[in-house]
Amino acid sequence: VNGLLNRTDGKILPIGLIPAGSGNSVLHDLDLITPAKAARAIIAGNTRFIDVAQIQMNHLLTYSINLIGWGLVTDVGKRSEAFRWLGPSRYTLSSIIEIFLRKTRKARLVIDQKTIVGQFSFIAACNSVHVGKGMKMAPSAELSDGLIDLLTVEGDITRRRLLSVLPKLFDGTHVNEPEVTYYQASSFSLYPETDDTLNIDGELLGTTPIDVSVLKHAI
């Protein structure tokens, strides 16, 4: 996606997607979760537009079609690198460790001109419903609606409540919990007190602060 949007000639080409990763989140949204089904869609020439989130950092411009995560979302990704030998289970172990550490960060979050200042456990901005391996992080998200869906867990949430809320990510019912706030926006900015690494489409990349805007039907 980054290579396509950085073309100097501005030409946009169709992208064929075949699931070969560990999560295949966007393909879950497209209902193309098997290689055979994805290949048939490509052969048939089935195309559709997808929005892209443009992320401006201090010295980097990058793009996302799935997830921009900050806080606990990134901490789990960082810690899991030490447990790669565990396979997919490394994320479960890393999540438990980070829940018990219960780190929060102070930040200013601006969502379509609305400003929120406070302590956050994590913020996740999603273009797709699914993140990771089948988690329904943003159940109201649409790949081509011109909006990005943000979830925040604010305040001093307890370990017990985190352990209760996070498993509900798999069926999307976490959005009904009082500690979770759900927004839809065309742009947002995040300014933490300290610079932190981000989780962008499953990769640890860049640092805050960031300014994000949705490029509707960019690919």
Please provide the spans of the model-predicted regions.
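Conserved Motif II region of HX4D acyltransferases
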Residues: V1-N2, I123, G202
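Short, solvent-exposed amphipathic alpha-helical segments in soluble enzyme
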Residues: L5-N6, E81-A82, P139-E142, L166-F170
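Catalytic core of DAGKc-family lipid kinases
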Residues: L5-S121, A125
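A generic structural signal for well-ordered coil/turn residues at beta-strand boundaries
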Residues: F49, S64, K103-R105, Q119, ...
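Glycine-rich phosphate/pyrophosphate-binding beta-alpha loops
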Residues: G69, A124-A138, L204
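Short acidic/glycine-rich loop or secondary-structure boundary segments that cap or lie
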Residues: V73-V76, V117-Q119, V131-G134, T158-R161
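Gly/Ser/Thr-rich active-site loops/lids in small-molecule metabolic enzymes
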Residues: R84-R90, P139-R160
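ATP/nucleoside-binding phosphotransfer catalytic cores, i.e., glycine-rich phosphate-binding loops
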Residues: I111, V117, E142, T152-I219
